[in-house]
Each structure stands twice: as C-alpha cells, then as structure tokens.
A protein has these predicted regions:
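Short aromatic-glycine-(Arg/Gly/Cys) micro-motifs in beta-strand/loop hairpins
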Residues: 1-21
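Mixed-charge, polar/low-complexity N-terminal
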Residues: 5-7, 29-30, 69
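Compositionally biased, intrinsically disordered low-complexity regions
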Residues: 16, 28, 62-64
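Mixed-charge, Lys/Arg-enriched low-complexity segments
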Residues: 40-72
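A short, charged, amphipathic alpha-helix used as a generic interaction element across diverse proteins
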Residues: 29-42
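A short, exposed loop/beta-hairpin motif centered on an aromatic-Gly-Thr core
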Residues: 21-29
Length: 72
C-alpha cells in the first residue's frame, strides 16, 4: 500500500511538492515545512513522524535532501 503522503523530488528551485492521495497540500523548502503542511491538514503533532514510511513516501531523497534538481 502506498503511503498517504508523498514528498516529491526537489524542483529546480529546491521546493518539493507535498501531496496526499494526488491532492496538492503545498510546496515545502524544508522538513519543517512538510511538518507544518501536515499539521495544517489536521494531523496531530504526535502522529507525524517524518521518517515513517507508512505515512510518508520520500521521492528523490529523504527529509535531508533539499538541493535544487540538476539543470535548474
């Protein structure tokens, strides 16, 4: 089963799209931004574990990867 939250690879500007079941939640420039977006959609602080693969699928690098995509 695919995790409900997907953090997409960094764009040319370094931002990463964050989606929930194909719905765009917003753009993140840091792991803290991802955390804030998840709080904003109703998750409780204690429910959010950024390294939990059952909750979040990180594409193009994990929560430490925020460098712009090549060619940007």
């Amino acid at each position: 089963m695919t995790p409900p939250i997907v953090v997409h690879p960094p764009s040319a500007s370094g931002e990463r799209r964050v989606t929930a079941h194909t719905e765009l939640l917003g753009l993140a420039r840091s792991a803290q931004d991802v955390f804030a977006l998840l709080l904003g959609v109703g998750l409780k602080e204690q429910e959010i574990q950024l390294d939990d693969p059952a909750l979040i699928e990180w594409r193009g690098g994990g929560p430490e990867e925020w460098r712009p995509a090549p060619g940007g």
